[in-house]
């Protein structure tokens, strides 16, 4: 990463924050989990306690509410689901242009893996982390890690 990229990354990161996250049953719209916390902070491993029934759903709708001071040309995120440090799944989401000094809500639908590939909650519990890298184009803004616990 060049000096200009580092400066751009730091400038965007300073004015970027996650305000809240909501996970819903994509079929019914029912809220399964929500948290008013800045999950974009890179210096800590975050924790999320989600209902075990989320593992039985066909698809989950994720809403991210975020604020940014800086404009972003091509806001996107890459997400890796890791089990004991090994990648199980990887997803790529692209939002595109984000205006400066705005608060935005970004909704995405995530479909479940085939049932034959699912592991039981007792095996997954505490062993799954979601690593999310936030980008503006190719410039990394922030990277966060959330450890999942099923309740």
Curated annotation (Swiss-Prot):
Gene Ontology terms: biological process: sensory perception of light stimulus
Compartment annotation: Nucleus; Cytoplasm
InterPro entries per UniProt: Ig_E-set (IPR014756), PDED_dom (IPR008015), PDED_dom_sf (IPR037036), Rhodop-sen_GMP-Pdiesterase_dsu (IPR017287)
Keywords, in A-Z order: cGMP, Cytoplasm, Nucleus
Signal peptide interval: none
Major place of residence: nucleus
Disulphide bridges, residue numbers: none
Keyword flag Nucleus: yes
Keyword flag Ribonucleoprotein: no
GO CC annotation, single: nucleus
PANTHER family (alphabetical): RETINAL ROD RHODOPSIN-SENSITIVE CGMP 3',5'-CYCLIC PHOSPHODIESTERASE DELTA-SUBUNIT, RETINAL ROD RHODOPSIN-SENSITIVE CGMP 3',5'-CYCLIC PHOSPHODIESTERASE SUBUNIT DELTA
Known partners and oligomeric status: Interacts with Pde6.
Similarity comment: family membership: Belongs to the PDE6D/unc-119 family.
Protein name as catalogued: Probable cGMP 3',5'-cyclic phosphodiesterase subunit delta
């Amino acid at each position: 990463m060049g000096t200009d990229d580092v400066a751009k990354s730091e400038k965007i990161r300073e004015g970027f924050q996650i305000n809240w996250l909501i996970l819903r049953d994509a079929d019914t719209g029912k809220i399964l989990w929500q948290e008013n916390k800045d999950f974009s902070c890179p210096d800590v491993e975050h924790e999320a306690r989600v209902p075990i029934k989320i593992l039985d759903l066909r698809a989950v709708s994720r809403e991210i509410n975020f604020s940014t001071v800086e404009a972003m040309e091509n806001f996107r995120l890459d997400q890796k689901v890791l089990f004991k440090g090994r990648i199980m799944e990887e997803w790529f989401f692209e939002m595109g242009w984000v205006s400066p000094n705005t608060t935005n809500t970004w909704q995405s639908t995530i479909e479940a893996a085939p049932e034959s590939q699912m592991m039981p909650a007792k095996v997954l519990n505490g062993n799954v982390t979601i690593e999310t890298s936030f980008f503006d184009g190719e410039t990394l803004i922030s990277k966060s890690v959330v450890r999942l616990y099923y309740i």
